[in-house]
Amino acid sequence: MKKTALLNAQLSHCIATLGHTESLTICDAGLPIPLSVERIDLALTAGVPSFLQTLNVVTNEMYVERVVIAEEIKEKNPEILTALLTQLQQLESHQGNQIQVEFESHETFKKFTLESKAIVRTGECSPYANVILYSGVPF
């Protein structure tokens, strides 16, 4: 059995096989997931697992160099945005790099998800709690 926090085999495999600049999306329960993209559905019930819990576990396994967030989160969900940016700052410190943070319209964000290797659906039920993580290299 694995020693690290991430126990979900499908998600662990996805992260392990990410190449440089490939992306993984973590989303709330409502984001539309294109049929052409692998769905890793972790949602059990409203709020379980949360967006932030899932982000924390994923970023313990994944080296991140860039993220994309929907612009609308600034107005519609500032609490999650603040917590997300705090987690990214902590990740920068842990990884020893600067993570590029980009904001795009929600419509553009959804188009970007088409290029994700997978989309991880959480039980989060708050608006615009979504992020696209782009893989970096730790060297």
UniProtKB/Swiss-Prot annotation:
The active site is at residue 20. This is D-ribose pyranase. GO terms for cellular component: cytosol. GO terms for molecular function: D-ribose pyranase activity; intramolecular lyase activity; monosaccharide binding. SUPFAM superfamilies: RbsD-like (SSF102546). Catalyzes the interconversion of beta-pyran and beta-furan forms of D-ribose. It is found in: Cytoplasm. Belongs to the RbsD / FucU family. RbsD subfamily. The gene is rbsD. PANTHER family: D-RIBOSE PYRANASE. It holds the Pfam family RbsD_FucU. It comes from Haemophilus influenzae (strain PittGG). Its EC number is 5.4.99.62. Keywords: Carbohydrate metabolism, Cytoplasm, Isomerase. The keyword Metal-binding does not apply. One of its GO terms (biological process) is D-ribose catabolic process.
